[in-house]
Amino acid sequence: CLGAQLRRYDKGGEQFYDQISALHKSVRGSHPDAALYWLTRMLDGGADARYLARRIVRMAWEDIGLADPRAMQIANDAALTYERLGSPEGELALGQAVIYLAVAAKSNAGYNAYNAAKAFVKQDKSREVPVHLRNAPTKLMKELGYGHEYRYAHDEPNAYAAGETYLPDGMAEP
């Protein structure tokens, strides 16, 4: 048809990565209309909906995180719904998930904390588990003091063992 508009899209080239970036940044920027547009544009262009579902789940964990734990459930449920229904019905679940993520409260604190811990562990030496935190399934381990002086948090006021240490020796509490 002469009046048909040509869409700019490629399944793995620059247009693909530009559009997935626009989708992710629209969610991060709390713009549901733009997020839904980019998702729909990619689906219309032939993007693998399973790839998009995976990216939507990642957005929930990376950009919304603990600010709205329900977002992670919705993203996972949308991916599972797509797997169960396929296209085109399952695409609605992906669209609704994108809208929810875009309007959800945002926090990348968990993402940043995990990356900082990962970087620290990679450069740090291997530290021993403190004796009071060690498992003591045998008599010998108990005799060696494994688990001795561990304070069971549920037996403490407000289920909090104030002053108990959980990090390896030599590591300062944050």
Label for each model-derived stretch:
Residues G29-P174:
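Terminal-proximal interaction/regulatory segments of ATP-powered molecular machines
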Residues C1:
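Extracellular and organelle-lumenal recognition/adhesion modules and their flexible linkers in secreted
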Residues Q5-R41, R54:
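Conserved helicase/translocase motor-coupling segment
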